[in-house]
């Protein structure tokens, strides 16, 4: 399937598609700890801030349909963390386990290295075994777990921290 996939920088025209992907996971999983859907203006502002801060938003498309996206932001908003980022990656729920995530992450790694990023952090709900295994396959290591740090769907949630040195 990877022959049909195009990986490129997101444009403003992709925002609604990215929004649909994110909002699906907000509504249907603990992959994202938000309770309420993101509105398009919030994502447009995030997109514009990413451009201003030279932080990528990368999309995967098949036949001009956005099937996944990946991005990163500085891990903490303090100068001492300027070489550390936390990433997000989501694939459309009908397009998981098809190699799209790996293509997105490979491009994200290239972007991070080009921006002199030293390390990338993944914060993953401990019940999301597929994402944990995916990150292991990419070379991330498990560095810890935050116990009962989140709360969603009437339950406390643990978050795994994973890291890769680039």
Regions found by a protein language model. Give the residues of each.
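A short beta-loop-alpha structural element at the N-terminal edge
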Residues: 5-20
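Helix-loop element at the rim of GNAT/NAT acetyltransferase active sites that forms part
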Residues: 20-37, 50
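Acetyl-CoA-dependent GNAT
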Residues: 35-94, 105, 165
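Conserved catalytic-core motifs of GNAT/GCN5-like acyltransferases
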Residues: 74, 121-124, 136, 141-158
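Active-site acidic-Proline motif in GNAT/NAT acetyltransferases
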Residues: 89-94, 98, 110, 126-127
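Conserved acetyl-CoA-binding loop-helix of GNAT-fold acetyltransferases
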Residues: 97-110, 133-137
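Conserved GNAT acetyl-CoA-binding A-motif
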Residues: 112-124
């Amino acid at each position: 399937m990877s022959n049909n996939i195009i990986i490129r920088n997101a444009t403003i025209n992709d925002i609604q598609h990215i929004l649909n992907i994110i909002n699906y996971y907000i509504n249907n999983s603990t992959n994202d700890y938000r309770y309420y859907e993101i509105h398009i203006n919030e994502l447009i502002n995030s997109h514009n801030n990413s451009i201003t801060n030279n932080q990528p938003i990368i999309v995967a498309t098949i036949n001009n349909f956005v099937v996944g996206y990946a991005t990163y932001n500085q891990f903490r908003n303090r100068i001492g963390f300027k070489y550390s980022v936390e990433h997000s990656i989501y694939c459309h729920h009908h397009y998981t386990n098809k190699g799209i995530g790996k293509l997105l992450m490979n491009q994200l790694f290239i972007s991070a290295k080009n921006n002199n990023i030293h390390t990338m952090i993944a914060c993953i709900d401990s019940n999301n075994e597929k994402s944990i295994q995916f990150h292991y396959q990419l070379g991330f290591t498990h560095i810890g777990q935050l116990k009962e740090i989140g709360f969603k769907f009437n339950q406390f949630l643990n978050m795994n921290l994973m890291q890769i040195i680039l």
